[in-house]
């Protein structure tokens, strides 16, 4: 027997069954960088059609988390698939490097600027800190197998990028979109700075809910509006009632707002017990609910009036000695409250807008630290949130408080400090959404973009329609300066602003943003102007920094310098989490439309947030955090990459140890399929051993055809960014089409056919074609494993799979072929039915293995005609030692029905001897002299010309 073992074509490969990825991947990674793989890809793709995926910059602070890994892996898969599709797709990773979180970290170590450390030194410390953070994150991203311009990423703090951010501001100002205004903005009292929309998050908070009386200044004039008849005008004090959850804003109250079209009622509160008689004005729809919460049971209506009739009536401020007007506003509703809104133009966006219309004072008695200014009557020196109780006490004392209780509601918080914020009117710089038609143009451009998923379009449209002006100024130290000069008396911009901005940008390009603070104005504009103008000392919102990277990076980097006729937009694709509709997607769109009149991207693709296996947010306190480093150290990056590609990432993306274990199981199945291919290509040289397609065994041609069909679907799914469809198709191909059928059937031929004979070489030709395609399908997702396979494959090839393109050597079966796809589908159905009966026979101890079986198939005429096309090779497809086809009319009593109509099968144990080489039970075993242990087929395969196979 041992002599015959040497004659078998046994599989052999250096590609191990176990991936051992955690140890093997770092070695491969070093090889990639030693050989400059990214540079090799760029050389190979030079001159090809371009594809630009522009990286949204993560913030340079802390370790990367699983959301970062999801985002960067998705981008890398898409870039690699585009490269294989023949695109030149450079990838320049970026980092957001200015802003408050870095300032806070440096403050902890060095103190606040202007105290223990100068502002210039503080900026330098921030720059150093950010650089260290970038390097840490960079190594983590590289470990995930992400290819890119890691030696020259973009950082918003690079001098050239800072200069281009300043130039962007100049372009926006030049297009007429810049606005200086004293407006209420989101203000964090802990940051001591304005916040952008994207820096605000909403959390539940308990607040005092109060109903407050504003007594009518002219009772007769007010009563007249309600047309109450003589003698029925009621009794007691006459007031409008406002409702608010921010008592601290009442010192800044300058009006009460009603809706022009709402009906208001004059309610007589009757004297009853301790309740005094009084008259209250409320929205008719809300009067009952106000009375209920105030505990007033005895009341009746005196008269009604439209909101429009009450305009400009005067009411006394509840604790200051001045009157405020009744005004009309569209923002007033009857969803809650009293239908009358307390209006403080310095503390609310809607209040500000309506206040401008009525020329109200925009009072702001609150300092940047959230404390009332020294001249604030009654409340000077108190922090606004602590002052709520003081305000309520004063209202009680003045008899102005109708009712108060605590409510829990959604309230804006600072995204960094997680503390409640306020609206506060301050002089700020804005990008105006309407003064030069920016909102309308942005909405028009939204329609030209392909949003994936589609709901992204309506989401961003709603946000742009409703958003206020973009407040781009910050009162911070570590940021790109708003490099403008304003007139000391009029606050007007210098008439040569664009020219001056370019001069400043050139200085910043050379020395960084510190050049602005070191700048002597006279050197830039001459002594005369220098006496009249001063520098703006605010810095830019970090969302402006990242928002203008379509210009500061994409339009400016040499790597993206493609022929203009190819480019319809700065970038082809932006890909970030779905929270970026209110963040980076929006800041990029607004700035690009403001600068260039068009969207910066052709497509926008969003992914959901990562949650645990139970759908809960990742949280250290819950203990459900999955760190990318832990996964790569334990399972390897390819498992993490396969997890990313296996999920429908447009929804929430779940991860847990169990989910990653499932990815590891799927990985093993794919790896083992690839290993089978490689092991059975042992001894195959594609330059000399390829069998022409028309001469290949029919089943081998079918297998290549299945790979051809799979490749078409896989490339289409890659092109449409449906990565989970890629992995599903890949798994189906490996497990079902190959593993459950083709690879199972060909083992006999591959192992036992004549070494280097036609039957074996046909099979190896198919395996070679398929693995050439398979390794490329895998490469964008399981990059390390694909590279490992590539290095074990036979034949001459490029150094790396990543520099090539999809394999073009596959071919499909023609539908006109006799043994076409439909034929092989039917044969697989027959095989599945036979296998069930073989399993049953094995369970009943009729046979041991399937090769011990002799089967007879009783088939109807149509099915018999199909099966008979395989002639005497049917047994190889069914993995039995003998298979005979007979008409259904001759069916024996022992034949059993199958799941297929028109097919019965009789399973019997073979009485023939077993061939010690191929294990088939065949009548001619022992009949050939000198080869008593083997069958005639094996003798031919060992010493003769080898068996002939046509079909299987």
Swiss-Prot record:
Keyword Nucleotide-binding tagged: yes
Subunit structure: Monomer.
List of residues binding L-isoleucyl-5'-AMP: 576
Family: Belongs to the class-I aminoacyl-tRNA synthetase family. IleS type 1 subfamily.
Domain text: IleRS has two distinct active sites: one for aminoacylation and one for editing. The misactivated valine is translocated from the active site to the editing site, which sterically excludes the correctly activated isoleucine. The single editing site contains two valyl binding pockets, one specific for each substrate (Val-AMP or Val-tRNA(Ile)).
SUPFAM superfamilies in the record: Anticodon-binding domain of a subclass of class I aminoacyl-tRNA synthetases (SSF47323), Nucleotidylyl transferase (SSF52374), ValRS/IleRS/LeuRS editing domain (SSF50677)
Entry-linked InterPro entries: aa-tRNA-synth_I_CS, aa-tRNA-synth_Ia, Anticodon_Ile_BEm, Ile-tRNA-ligase, Ile-tRNA-ligase_type1, Ile-tRNA_ligase, M/V/L/I-tRNA-synth_anticd-bd, Rossmann-like_a/b/a_fold
Name of the encoding gene: ileS
Record localization: Cytoplasm
Gene3D superfamilies: 1.10.730.20, HUPs, Valyl/Leucyl/Isoleucyl-tRNA synthetase, editing domain
Keywords of this entry: Aminoacyl-tRNA synthetase, ATP-binding, Cytoplasm, Ligase, Metal-binding, Nucleotide-binding, Protein biosynthesis, Zinc
UniProt motif ('KMSKS' region) ranges: 617-621
GO molecular function: aminoacyl-tRNA deacylase activity; ATP binding; isoleucine-tRNA ligase activity; tRNA binding; zinc ion binding
Catalytic reaction annotation: tRNA(Ile) + L-isoleucine + ATP = L-isoleucyl-tRNA(Ile) + AMP + diphosphate
Cofactor: binding details: Binds 1 zinc ion per subunit.
Short motif 'HIGH' region, span: 58-68
Binding-site list for ATP: 620
Residues that bind Zn(2+): 915, 918, 935, 938
Protein name: Isoleucine--tRNA ligase
EC number: 6.1.1.5
Main location: cytoplasm
